[in-house]
Amino acid sequence: MSDSHLTAFDKASKAGFIIALGIVYGDIGTSPLYTMQSLVENQGGVNQVSESFILGSISLIIWTLTLITTIKYVLIALKADNHHEGGIFSLFTLVRKMSPWLIIPAMIGGATLLSDGALTPAVTVTSAIEGLKAVPGLSHIYQNQTNIIITTLVILIVLFGIQRFGTGFIGKIFGPVMFIWFSFLGVSGFFNTLGHLEIFKAINPYYALHLLFSPENHRGIFILGSIFLATTGAEALYSDLGHVGRGNIYVSWPFVKMCIVWSYCGQAAWILANKHSGIELNPFFASVPSQLRVYLVSLATLAAIIASQALISGSFTLVSEAMRLKIFPLFRVTYPGANLGQLYIPVINWILFAVTSCTVLAFRTSAHMEAAYGLAITITMLMTTILLKYYLIKKGTRPILAHLAMAFFALVEFIFFLASAIKFMHGGYAVVILALAIVFVMFIWHAGTRIVFKYVKSLNLNDYKEQIKQLRDDVCFDLYQTNVVYLSNRMQDHMIDRSILYSILDKRPKRAQVYWFVNVQVTDEPYTAKYKVDMMGTDYMVRVNLYLGFRMPQTVPRYLRTIVQDLMESGRLPKQEQEYTITPGRDVGDFRFVLIEERVSNARQLSNFERFIMQTKASIKHVTASPMRWFGLQYSEVTLEVVPLILSDVLKLPIKELVPVEDSEA
């Protein structure tokens, strides 16, 4: 990359500042909707809290945001960019060569981040709609929780329903709306604290530590499960690095942190002023004058929708990266907008919708959802910490310093994990089960790929070059196609899968003018699009290594069309004039893509465990996108051939011929 590009990535701008507010901070920016409510309700209500409890809670929130979000993610993790892209899979690609076992924290972290993303829309939208309970004129309608559930589900149906059309047309308003949202948080919090300046004593971490061990704290260390809600969006902040650039996050985060801290302090001040009033409304809405609440609910709903949209888009990106890293099944991906970064995965969209809707119906209130929320993301953060340690060592940090720094964050996050573990019995089990299911699928897919690499045999193309030439020139065979293309992800030098040569020469001899052997390799760089060609000393056998970034679509026909034109223009490939065509001057013949599917046979070499892995992977394949769709071959001529995983395994079964016995009397 050029220095100017790097500078642009680290540079901040006014437009970038606004865009960052709309993309990066949706999750962490809507946490004030429910964090203080969770703390107060778990303590027994507003009338049960003391000044020391409130000061301790605010102190815990401030220092959690400082340690985890500011220091770990903004100051450390943002430096771990993979060609300007962030997130746990981008981080994994930076360190995966350091140890093969690092695939484990990457898979666990990705799975828990996905499962958390399914819960976020339910929590944020429900919390926003519940604010209608505090609106004069509407409170009598929305005191009935069923009406809140119906309204929430309608919003979710619309939100997930528009994903297929792309969200670029509404994405332009995300930034301005979130700027208004954060400004409101800051201003309202500021005015609420004017009468209770003692709130600012919470900056002293003494109050945080005192509360953890105070008898006034009814929940003990488990209070951290509610405190953690304030920083759940930190991982999303890192994942969205590539969308806005490091410089814009550096500039916008101080503004965002100031506004949300003011909001928490303002809610705390309202609680101290009204703890004997008997009011049991959410402090976030109750701390605002009643005549403004309807506008606040509208703004909060928009902010919740924006936060949910960011999580949905992030889930699509996460799954797309996992597919290209070959640790997740292939699902159909579409690009509804002009931007490659704006993608849509139908299966994932409707799975998220189903899980989110079931969460709303099962838990009914935001308070019950909060009881289950946050457990998964603590695991994601722990996995990111593990990968960050290896990244720091790779970048030259002294190992002892890298170990100490990451051990500190791992300890803090492990304490939050233990505090959140109690949520397992209050609904967190649903998120854990979902995460385990995703990890299981990832493990099966990854292990199945390794088994194929272990057993599939390769042959040297040079040894069969003469046979292929004879077949090409043998007019006794009808021309199968002008160009025959084989896709293989296991092509190295001149070695190629035995199944491909078996398809060309044995299964049905395929006579063609040119044989193409294409290997698609996913690179660690997100947006690479390069290729390398080896003609093997011929003009009829072409080996193509196609290098695509892990965020690039693998639409092979488009790339191959460009490669063919380049080879013909350079004279390395003869032109293929067409006698019959509606396109004047067309000099490229027809193509047929041959896809080979390896299936498990009764091979004795496979262990029972390996057979289970391969059979399970085959079952998963039935509900995923076909390679034809994944490689963009829907409008091309495609032949699918099935071969056994182990071609050499030919069993000679004992069998006897029945010979007719002559009649003895004859």
Curated annotation (Swiss-Prot):
The species is Streptococcus pyogenes serotype M4 (strain MGAS10750)
Q: GO cellular-component terms in the record?
A: plasma membrane
Gene Ontology terms for molecular function: potassium ion transmembrane transporter activity; symporter activity
Protein name in the entry? Probable potassium transport system protein Kup
**Which compartment or compartments is the protein found in?**
Cell membrane
- Entry keyword annotation includes Transmembrane helix: yes
Domain of life of the organism in this record? Bacteria
What are the protein's UniProt keywords? Cell membrane, Ion transport, Membrane, Potassium, Potassium transport, Symport, Transmembrane, Transmembrane helix, Transport
Q: What does this protein do?
A: Transport of potassium into the cell. Likely operates as a K(+):H(+) symporter.
Q: Enumerate the transmembrane spans.
A: 16-36, 58-78, 100-120, 141-161, 165-185, 221-241, 253-273, 294-314, 343-363, 373-393, 399-419, 424-444
Q: Which family does it belong to?
A: Belongs to the HAK/KUP transporter (TC 2.A.72) family.
Claim: Iron is one of the keywords in the record: no
This protein's membrane topology, according to the annotation, is: Multi-pass membrane protein
Which chemical reaction does it catalyze? K(+)(in) + H(+)(in) = K(+)(out) + H(+)(out)
